[in-house]
Amino acid sequence: MDSWDQCPSDFSVAEFYGGDLEGVRQKLDYLQNLGVEVIYFNPLFVSPSNHKYDIQDYDYIDPHYGKIVEDGGGLLKDGVSDNRKAERYINRVTNKKNLEASNRFFAELVEEIHARGMKVILDGVFNHCGSFNKWLDREEIYQVSGDYEDGAFVSKDSPYRNFFGFQDQFAWPYNTTYEGWWGHDTLPKLNYEGSEKLYDDIMRVAAKWVSPPYNADGWRLDVAADLGHSPEMNHKFWRDFRKSVKTANPDAIILAEHYGDPKEWLQKGDQWDTVMNYDAFMEPLTWFLTGMEKHSDEAKPQLKGSVKDFEDSMRHYMASFQTSQLLCAMNELSNHDHSRFMTRTNEKVGRAATLGTAAAEEGIKPAVFREAVVVQMTWPGAPTIYYGDEAGLCGFTDPDNRRTYPWGKEDIVLIDFHRDIIRIHKEHEALRTGSLMFLKGDDNLLCYARFNRREQFVVLVNNKEQERDVELEVWQCGIPKKAVLERVIISNETGYSLMPKQYEVADGVLKIK
């Protein structure tokens, strides 16, 4: 791309802005100063796309993100789609010097991140790979390089033939009848039932990246419930995956992308540790504060401000978690699959393709976004910030939500707000591991407490523009019947403040005017 500020187009998988792991390294001071404790990377392994959910080689960091030490070769000419002629790309991603240098750089980066007291989570895409993958080699780039065995697309005698499910066993060479995830031929589904070698190789990969010298601190698992062709295989795979990972690194976390009830994978503690928390965080909070669906594809005004619906949803979906699983669940407001929360505050239904990218920034309500962040930082779970949210970045659902970070155009006040609320979250044990109690629910007014034996927090979220009087029976959460509470932060239409203010509790009741 010529312009850093240009928004991604609808078919932008081959558009690159030049970001890499060296750029992350240069911004570690910023992340550390913000209060970040864990960096979750979207896929980093070799892949032809910018999103990299179509992995080409599980054993190597993409040199475009890592290190290109040997370059050269011609570029594809305009109008040419034969990737066998993409000489420069082939050299970059198949040359072992580039691949090994990229792995070394990643190991060094993780070491530096660890030295700063932060951790690293990798994105694991094990349900499917990409059509460029060396095991399939539909684009024949590994065939061209001459240093690799034949891919399953190329030859029926490929050692990887059973890594994929082919419908036509007589269509070689160049067999296009392999199974694709959701029918996408660019995303070949991996056939674990058909290949013990594939199964074992992925178990090796799972352990490799959480072991020295790479020492990642865990995996986020893409479309984890889709893996395999039966529930039995799915659960067996994740049990074995857990054994491989935890044997290599007992402290590594395993969290899954999952929509719906995760109980099958969580209840015995033998598969996933936790999940990306859509049902028990992102969705109920989005409906309550904005009345919007998480892709901005639908509006339900009746849910906006409905504390009853919010509380009912939270109670129902949180019941699927054990406490330890809930406390480390990934609580996001935005991510790479959904519209950014700031854009949802404008309550516009649609996508960039129909409304235009500028519409994502029109009519946004930063005050509502700050409300969401307050809940995120005071709710049970691991608050997870999608890059740029803290700087005011907008965007409809993907790919528009994958805009570049707005360097030089950040909302500095919003960054300061995040830094302060993150600090508050980290300084108080009650906000991280304390009990949760709903105190009061009214039209657009949500009140709850987080508390333990040593400290108690009362959180009030008024989703109306008008100020209102509130009376709460706070004795229920362990606050003495006669006490003085101190305000730690307030956010409103004009901004936020850390100015302390005291409130008296009389007969166990807190009154706020």
What are these regions (language model features)?
Residues Q32-I39, H114-I121, N215-W219, N249-I253, ...:
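Loop/turn elements at helix/coil->beta-strand transitions in domains of secreted/extracellular proteins
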Residues L31, F41, Y58, I113, ...:
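Conserved, mostly hydrophobic/aromatic
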Residues V13-D20, D147-Y148, S155-Y160, Y174-H184, ...:
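Extended substrate-binding grooves/exosites of carbohydrate-active enzymes
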